[in-house]
From Swiss-Prot:
Function: Catalyzes the direct conversion of aminodeoxyfutalosine (AFL) into dehypoxanthine futalosine (DHFL) and adenine via the hydrolysis of the N-glycosidic bond; this reaction seems to represent an essential step in the menaquinone biosynthesis pathway in Helicobacter species. Can also probably catalyzes the hydrolysis of 5'-methylthioadenosine (MTA) and S-adenosylhomocysteine (SAH) to adenine and the corresponding thioribose, 5'-methylthioribose and S-ribosylhomocysteine, respectively.
Protein name according to UniProt: Aminodeoxyfutalosine nucleosidase
Alphabetical list of Gene3D superfamilies matching this protein: Nucleoside phosphorylase domain
UniProt subunit comment: Homodimer.
NCBIfam families: MTA_SAH-Nsdase, PRK05584.1
Catalytic activity line of the entry: 6-amino-6-deoxyfutalosine + H2O = dehypoxanthine futalosine + adenine; S-adenosyl-L-homocysteine + H2O = S-(5-deoxy-D-ribos-5-yl)-L-homocysteine + adenine; S-methyl-5'-thioadenosine + H2O = 5-(methylsulfanyl)-D-ribose + adenine; 5'-deoxyadenosine + H2O = 5-deoxy-D-ribose + adenine
Record carries keyword Transmembrane helix: no
An example Gene Ontology CC term for this record: cytosol
Keyword tags: Amino-acid biosynthesis, Hydrolase, Menaquinone biosynthesis, Methionine biosynthesis
Enzyme Commission no: 3.2.2.30, 3.2.2.9
PANTHER family, per database record: 5'-METHYLTHIOADENOSINE/S-ADENOSYLHOMOCYSTEINE NUCLEOSIDASE (PTHR46832), 5'-METHYLTHIOADENOSINE_S-ADENOSYLHOMOCYSTEINE NUCLEOSIDASE (PTHR46832:SF1)
Amino acid sequence: MVQKIGILGAMREEITPILELFGVDFEEIPLGGNVFHKGVYHNKEIIVAYSKIGKVHSTLTTTSMILAFGVQKVLFSGVAGSLVKDLKINDLLVAIQLVQHDVDLSAFDHPLGFIPESAIFIETSESLNALAKEVANEQHIVLKEGVIASGDQFVHSKERKEFLVSEFKASAVEMEGASVAFVCQKFGVPCCVLRSISDNADEEANMSFDAFLEKSAQTSAKFLKSMVDEL
């Protein structure tokens, strides 16, 4: 049986190196306002797409991958802002848990990040995370692990950084991972969210992001391909 693997990024810049690294002929399939790139790599069917920025877009794209293309695993590759001192530009981080940091139902006495009939933290796949660690060890790459906070805002202030660390013990922040992991969890599809650090989520974040986006995206993409090679 051919294994079907979904590979996601948020932006075109995040999937361009992925498409180039796999080096196969991809069929382009339009669906739901997006384009999915379908190809065969080492007897594995891979579906690659960028969702566009934000939780709504990434939810739509992940759901499409699962329901329309039948992917059995989802790997997310992209960039994020660091919230902690030991995560530097171009470092790699795999999410053990994710949280929607902009969810606030505290008016109803719910903790921040919590939605009724759900949970604050969204788990990722233990087996895929273990594979990521194995690949990192084999390649002598330092792979950090931690909580990633996702929200529909580009974080670029010290105050917000400090809040995300104190409230959620988050190591990095981005805009899609939690929604991708949530969809996968609900459909029972193993998910791994891999991020390379592009900025420090501070007042200089917009300039740092632009400067390091391409390099950080390539770092994440190369590591993701190594994971696919082992699946």
